[in-house]
Amino acid sequence: MASSKGGNTTAHINTLHHRLYHALNLGFRVCDEKEKKWKCTDIEIQRHVVKSISAFLDCFSRATANNRLIKDSISDIAGALVFILGSKNRAVVGLAANVVIRLIRIVPPSILHSYSLDLVESLSPLLCCQQFDVSLPCAVALNAILVNVRETKEKEVWKILEDEKTVVSVVGNLQIFSEGSMSVEWFQEMALLLSTIMLKWPQSRYSVWNNPALMGVLESVSQKPDMGLTVATLKLYSSLALCGHGANELLDNGKPMLDMMISCMEESSSQNARIEGLKLAQRLATGNRECLKMINMCSESLVKATVRTMGKWFLSSGKLELDQMSLLVEACKLALITRWEGQHHIYFWKYRISEALLSLVVENFHSQSLDGYVSLEEEVLVAEKVLNANFLPSLRSYVWDIIGFLAAHCEEEFDSILRGDELCLNFLVTCACLSFSRSVQKGYQICQNDIISASHSESASRAVLMMICSPSKYISSRARVTLSFILEEGGEQNLNSLVNFLSYIPSSGGYILPNILQTTVCLVGFACYSSIPQYASFILRKQGLEILLSFCSWYQRNWENIGASSFAPSSQSITEKRICCWVCTEDWDNKDAFLLYALLALAELVNHSFFGQNHAEELSMKSGNLKDRLCTTLKEIRDGTYGSGPRWYAAHILSYFGYYGFEHKLGKRLMCAYEDEEYSDMRLLFASGNSASVNKVIIAVRCPMLLPPKEGAHSSSTISTEKSQRTVQEIRMSANVDILALVKLLEFAYSGYVEVESTTLKKLKPLAKHCKAKVLLQMLCRRRPKWGSSIPEIDIPLALTPKLIHFSDVILVPKETNVACFNCRMCSLTSPHAHSHRVILSSGCEYLRALFRSGMQESHLDRLNVPVSWLGLTKLVSWFYSDELPKPPSGCKWNNMDTEAKLDELQAYVEIYSLSEWWIMEELQNDCAHVILSCLESARELSIKTIELAASFSMWKLVEAAANHAAPIYHQLRDSGELDELDDELVNLIRTAAVQFSQQGG
C-alpha cells in the first residue's frame, strides 16, 4: 500500500482526514452570503480541532504536500486556524500557532498564498502577549509567512502590520528581554521577525533606530557570550543598516558594535556568525561617507578578517562546499570597499590580498610556487592553463574588480616588491590581461545572456584599464608591457574590428546600443589599446579621434535611452536594493560609464598626439574644425550633469588645450568680486609697478601661502560695533614672481578655472607648487585624474570656521531673538547671529552690493538685520558660501516628523523665497520653490498652511503652486473644515485648481 510519510498508509491518512472533518464540522456556520465558514468560540472544540489538524499534518512532508486530501483541505484548515487565533483564547492560541508553523513548513507558499493576509491579521495581535508559549510560536509563524509574502501583497500586509502595531509589539518584547525572564530562543525569534519586517518594509526602520532604549538593549545583548544572541543582534543591525539614517546612528555609537562584528568574522566563529558579520559590514559600507567612517574606527582589523576569510578555505573531494562558497562570496562583496579611497588600501596590501585573490583563481594555489625568474612568455602559458581550468568561475568577476580597484587607488610610490607580493600581483596582472584579450577576440560572439561569462569579460577588461591608469608606475608599466606582449599576435586585426564596431554606433542613426556588453568591452579595449604607442598610432591613422568624438556626441544626444553598462555581480542582493535614506556618492563607472571609457581612450590618443614622434603636430596642424569640435564637446561634458568620471576626464583632456579646472557658478560670482576692487583689503605690489587687488578671506581659504604669516590664522576674534573702516594692506612681491603667472593663479583661486597660454605654463607650475594648489598643479602637469576623485569644490565655507573668522566684517541678525541652546563659538554675543563677509554677500546679491556701496548709514554698520527665522538664516548663509541650498530632512526622518516640525522647515524656505524677491535673487528663489513643492509632493496636508504663509508674504506664484498640490485632496480638505480658515479668495483658488485637476483626469 502507498505511504505518505514515515509509514503512514493511505488508510491511516483517510482515517485522520475523516476525524479532521468530524472536528471541523463542529464549527462550520453558514454566513449571510450562504458561504460555509468556520466559527466556533468554544475552547474545547477549538482545542479538539487544533489537535485534529496537527494529527492530520503529521502524515505529510513538503515532498508529499501535493496529496489531493491535503490540497482539498487547506481552505478549511486555514479558515479554522485564522478564527481560532483571532478569538485570542490563550489556552489554545499557542497550540494553533504551532500548527500554523507546521502547516507553513509542509505546504508550499504558492498554495498558502491566498490565506497569508488572514493569517498575518490573526497572528499579529498575539505578539504583545507576555506568555512565552503564545508569543514565541506566533513570532515564528508570522516570520515564516512574511518571508514568503509576494511583492504584490506587500502593501496590504504592511497596512495590517501598521494597524496592529506589530513593530511596536516586537520592539517592546525585545526591550524587556533578559536572560532570567525570557529564553535566548525567544529573543532570537523576535529579533528574526523584526529583521524580516525591516528587510521588506523600509517604513518600519525609523521606529527601531530612533529608539534609544532598544539600541541600548541590543548593545548590551551583543556583549553577552551566547553566540545565538550575537547572531540575532547582527541580523537586526544588518536590517537596520539598510536605512542610511539608521546606519549612521549605528556608526555614531559604533565601536562596541564594530568590535562584535569583526569578532564574528574571525575563523573561530560559526559559519552563520561569520556570514552575518560580513553582511553587516557590507551594508554599513553602502555609502562612501559611511564606509570611511567605519574604516576609520576599525580599518586594519576589518581588512585582516576579510582577507583571511578570502584566503583560508579548503576543498572537499576536489570541490568547494556550499557553505564555504557562501562565505567566500560575502567576503568578496565586502572587499569591494576597495572601490573607495582610504587607509584600508594599505592594509589590503599588508595582509597579502594578491595571494588571497590568486588562491581564488588558481586551483591548489597554496601547494604551488610561482617562479620569479620565468619569462613573460612562460608566465602567459601558465596563465592560459589557469584560465582554461575555470576554477571557481562565480568568484572571478569579484577578483578582477577587487584587484582593479586596488590598482586604481595605489599611491605613485607604491612598490609591490618591497611588500613581498610581487609574484602574485604579476601573475594576476597577466591573467587579467589574457582574459581581456580573449574578450576582445570574441568580438561579436560575446553573449550578454550568459551572465557569468559576460561579467568575466566586463570586469577583466575594466581591471586592465584600471591597472593601466594606476598612479603606481610599477603596476601601470607592468600592465602595459604584459598587454603589449599578449596582443602581439593578431593585435591590429582585433583592433580593426573594434574600430569598425565603434564607428558603426554613431553612424547607424539608432538611439540605443546594439549590444551593451560588446560596447563596454569595445570601449575599454579601445582605451587599453590606445595606451600602447604602436596601437595608438594605428588608431589615429584610422581616424580614431573622430570616431571617439562622434561617439561622445552620439552619447550626449541619446544618454536617456542608454541603460546600465555593468554585468558584474553587485555587492547588493535583491533585499539590499530596498535601501532607504542613503545619500551615496556615485561610483565613477556607474553613471555614464560608456562616456567615461570613451574619454579614457580619447585622453590616451590626445596624449599620444601631443608627445608621439609621428603625431606631434596631429591636432595643431589639422583643420581647426576638429580641435574646435573636440573642445566644444569636452566643455559640454565637463560642465554638464554627467558623472564625476566623465567630467574629470573631459577637464583632463582640455588641459592639453590650455583650459584648466572646472567652471562653477560660485566661481563666476567670486571672479566678479576679484575684478571689482571695492571690497579688496589687500594689494599685491609687483616690482614693475603693477598691482593686483585681492580679498584676504578668499586668499586665506584658497591660497593661504600668499598671505603674510600673521594673517593666516587668528587665535581670537572680536566684532566691533563701530562703523566699519576698510583698510587695504599692501604686500610687496619678489621681483622673481612673474606677474602674469600670479594673476592666473589668482584667477584659479577665485573661480576654480583658468585659461593659460603655453608661454605662461612653465612659470605657473612652480608657483602653483609653492602655493600648494594641488588641483591646478595636477592639471598643469597633465596627470591623470585619480580614479574615484570627486569634482573639486570651491571650499569657501571654510571662511566660517573659527580659524578664519577674524576676517568677518559683518554680522547677520535674524528676526528671532530667542533660540534654544544658541551658542556662538566665534564670539561672546549671546543673541542669535551669523558671521559673514561683505565680499561673499555682495558677490551673490545685487541688492546687497548696492546697499554696501550706497554710502547710507546701513552700508557702514557691522550688523545687518535679515527678516527670516534663525533656521532660514542658516540656510541662506549656506547658499551664499556654497551656491547650494541645504535640503530639509529626507526619507524616514521627514516622513516621521510631526506636522509642526515640517511646517517650521517649510516656513524657512518660504521666508527665503520672499526675501529673494526683495533682494533680487532669482536663482535662489527658484531653488526655494523647488524645495517647497517637493515637500508638498510628499506631504500634501501641508498645502493649506503653506498657502496661508505664502499669502501673508504676498507670494502669489507660490500660493498658486501650493494650491495645485492641494487640488487632489480638495474634497478631503473641504469635509474636514480646514478650508474654513482661509479667505474666500484662497478657497476659490484651490477649488479652481481642483476642477482643473479633475478635468485632466486626476
From Swiss-Prot:
One GO term (biological process): protein ubiquitination
Annotated pathway: Protein modification; protein ubiquitination
Swiss-Prot/TrEMBL keywords: Repeat, Ubl conjugation pathway
Annotated BTB domain residues: 680-758, 808-889
Pfam families, A to Z: BTB
UniProt-listed InterPro entries: ARM-type_fold (IPR016024), At1g04390-like (IPR044953), BTB/POZ_dom (IPR000210), SKP1/BTB/POZ_sf (IPR011333)
Domain of life of the organism encoding this protein: Eukaryota
Domain free text: The BTB/POZ domain mediates the interaction with some component of ubiquitin ligase complexes.
Primary role: May act as a substrate-specific adapter of an E3 ubiquitin-protein ligase complex (CUL3-RBX1-BTB) which mediates the ubiquitination and subsequent proteasomal degradation of target proteins.
Name of the protein in its database record: BTB/POZ domain-containing protein At1g04390
Organism: Arabidopsis thaliana (Mouse-ear cress)
